[in-house]
């Protein structure tokens, strides 16, 4: 059996509350790669918060900034990148993610997303009267896009971040190189 080689670029996609940042850090640790959160990179580059960008520039302005960061981050080697939940809504992002690395979709049911995000005020798309309905709507819209771009799908329920990261490694080891 051939020795498995760690991919040099792993991109995590999935809805808010999937654990992309938490699991991404664990995965990077396990594989000896650098972890980068695309939302944190946007905030570092702009010097302002994601909610501020949404308030001032709207979602379209944020998506334009996100696309530039995704383009940059997907060109780096030795990284695990956690993308924002809506990154896949931009066709160019899907193309870059799929062409430049291995994409892992962290599938998470809405009930779990809601539990994980209910007290987080740093999520502009959840500032609604009915966050659960909003999450349902976003998942219905984005799940096909996550699946389209994903090389592997790993469910994030029923385990701590480290065990999810281990399941990702196992799933990646089963992928053709």
Curated annotation (Swiss-Prot):
InterPro entries: P-loop_NTPase, Shikimate/glucono_kinase, Shikimate_kinase/TSH1, Shikimate_kinase_CS. Substrate binds at residues 39, 63, 85, 142. It comes from the Bacteria. GO terms for biological process: amino acid biosynthetic process; aromatic amino acid family biosynthetic process; chorismate biosynthetic process. Its main location: cytoplasm. Keywords: Amino-acid biosynthesis, Aromatic amino acid biosynthesis, ATP-binding, Cytoplasm, Kinase, Magnesium, Metal-binding, Nucleotide-binding, Transferase. SUPFAM superfamilies: P-loop containing nucleoside triphosphate hydrolases. ATP binds at residues 17-22, 123, 160. One of its GO terms (cellular component) is cytosol. Its EC number is 2.7.1.71. It is found in: Cytoplasm. Its cofactor is Mg(2+). It catalyses: shikimate + ATP = 3-phosphoshikimate + ADP + H(+). Binds 1 Mg(2+) ion per subunit. Belongs to the shikimate kinase family. This is Shikimate kinase. It comes from Halorhodospira halophila (strain DSM 244 / SL1). The lineage of its organism: Bacteria, Pseudomonadati, Pseudomonadota, Gammaproteobacteria, Chromatiales.
């Amino acid at each position: 059996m051939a020795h498995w080689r760690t991919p040099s670029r792993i991109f995590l996609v999935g809805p808010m509350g999937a654990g992309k940042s938490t699991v991404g850090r664990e995965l990077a640790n396990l594989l000896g790669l650098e972890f980068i959160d695309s939302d944190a990179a946007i905030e570092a580059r702009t010097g302002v918060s994601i909610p501020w960008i949404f308030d001032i520039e709207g979602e379209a302005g944020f998506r334009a900034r996100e696309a530039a960061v995704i383009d940059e981050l997907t060109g780096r080697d030795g990284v695990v990148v956690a993308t924002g939940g809506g990154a896949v809504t931009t066709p160019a992002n899907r193309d870059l993610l799929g062409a430049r690395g291995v994409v892992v979709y962290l599938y998470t049911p809405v009930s779990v997303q809601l539990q994980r995000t209910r007290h987080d005020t740093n999520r502009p798309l959840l500032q609604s009267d009915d966050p659960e309905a909003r999450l349902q709507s976003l998942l219905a819209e984005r799940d096909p896009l996550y699946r389209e771009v994903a090389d592997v799908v790993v469910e994030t329920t029923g385990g701590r971040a480290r065990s999810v990261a281990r399941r990702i490694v196992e799933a990646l080891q089963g992928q053709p190189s």
